[in-house]
Amino acid sequence: CAAISLAFFARRMLELAPKAEYADVMESALYNTTLAGMALDGKSFFYVNPLEVNPYACHKDSRLRHVKPVRQKWFGCACCPPNVARIVESVQEYAYTVAEDGGTLFTHLYMGGVAKAELNGTAVELDVTANLPWYGDGKAVVRLGNDAAGASAQAPARFTLAFRLPGWVGGESAAAAAITATGESESGADSSRVTREIRDGYLYLTGEWRDGDTVTFDFPMPVRMLAANPLVREDAGKVAFVRGPITFCAEEKDNGANLHLMHADTEALLADPSVAKVEEFDFHAGATGIDEQGQGEVEDVTRRMVKLEVPAWREPLPAAVAAAGEGAAEVPAFAPLYTAYAPVKREP
């Protein structure tokens, strides 16, 4: 619910001022924590979704009994399941908005579908094909319908299409260069019938649009290392690995026990970001993971990180008897389910 509320808030901020930084936050909240809160079959849920889970510690600490290592079928206070259903059903309201003057259609999230809007009196459809969040390519085809008077609007219509320049691309210029539109560089009398302007993280394409005009995009998706805010005590000195809008996490399922001992050689990663590479994983068709080369105390090791929704496809690790004497309850082995942040290696 907290992640969904963050998406609500970011959308309201977009209505006040169309700035890409708000859409970046909204996208991150929707694609990561919100989706990870529900299993793929929709039958089990997380009530809380912390960055790290230590099942053994949660079992022993009565204050953390509500933190579960696996999704639960239901809760006594079950506001989260219907909240997830509501936002998934209404995701189109987060992907597109129309400016108050009725002349601009904003694309905030790049997802496949058809957006319908009336722009300056003309019925417009934007037919979008996108491969995000795994790949940065796609296209949006303009379809013109009838105007406000009911007449055919096959003739060019003037309006603006504004496309968000995602922060994860690596700068507005790089993102804008990845977008091209029909009519921007035509020869003859129709030369540059569509013009571009970058403002507040959006690329505004304005001009005389024709039925069938196409906007193509192919955003680069480098693996990025993000430092946590040191004012959050538990996150000080930690980093997250992100590719596109997806935040990745490390699990004992792939990396063995004692995830808390993992260190990232931040200097090496900053010097050569290609060390963190993307590869397909075998546990589920289409799932994508990151191989992150961590610097151990003695030797380099390869650590695997998976997108936050991945635990929906996995069984919890085998249970172990707590070392508390005879009759102790069985609890899952010391096995954090999520570790979105890896500690940064620091010199003494």
Residue ranges and their predicted role:
Residues 1-14, 81-91:
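Well-ordered alpha-helical segments within folded domains of soluble proteins
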Residues 171-206, 225-231:
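Solvent-exposed beta-strand/loop surfaces of large extracellular or lumenal domains
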Residues 138-140, 159, 201:
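Short beta-strand or tight-loop elements
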Residues 24-32, 37-137, 143, 150-154, ...:
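C-terminal beta-rich recognition modules with glycine/proline-rich loops and embedded aromatic residues
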Residues 156-169:
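Surface-exposed beta-strand/loop patches in extracellular or lumenal glycoproteins
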Residues 5-18, 35, 143-147:
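Well-ordered alpha-helical scaffold segments within catalytic/enzyme domains
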